[in-house]
Swiss-Prot record:
Keywords: Cell cycle, Cell division, Septation, Sporulation. This is Putative septation protein SpoVG. InterPro entries: SpoVG, SpoVG_sf. SUPFAM superfamilies: SpoVG-like. It comes from Bacillus licheniformis (strain ATCC 14580 / DSM 13 / JCM 2505 / CCUG 7422 / NBRC 12200 / NCIMB 9375 / NCTC 10341 / NRRL NRS-1264 / Gibson 46). Essential for sporulation. Interferes with or is a negative regulator of the pathway leading to asymmetric septation. The gene is spoVG. PANTHER family: SEPTATION PROTEIN SPOVG-RELATED. Signal peptide: none annotated.
Length: 97
């Protein structure tokens, strides 16, 4: 399995989320709403999730081994850093009404 495309939107929030990504796997399957989070130990990728009735978050889709997780994280963070080198980046305002 290979990540064959990454689409990334940087976001401007008060929280720790820095971007939202969509990835394509093997030119055949897309996963949306992957988040780039600025954590205590640096940037990491959080898979799409939803809140359960008891307030916990559960992944909607996620890799089942560390090798695949590494491929996804590397592809998304490489695109995040590549876009960081671009002079003018448009940020999407999240949570603004």
């Amino acid at each position: 399995m290979e990540v064959t495309d990454v689409r990334l939107r940087r976001v401007n929030t008060d929280g720790r989320m820095r971007a939202i990504a969509s990835i394509t796997l093997d030119h055949e399957f897309v996963v949306h709403d992957i988040r780039v989070i600025d954590g205590n130990n640096g940037l990491f990728v959080a898979m799409p999730s939803k809140r359960t009735p008891d307030g916990e978050f559960r992944d909607i889709a996620h890799p089942i081994n560390s090798s695949t997780r590494g491929k996804i994280q590397d592809a998304v963070l490489n695109e995040y850093h590549r876009l960081g080198d671009v002079e003018e980046i448009e940020y999407e305002e999240i949570g603004a009404s």
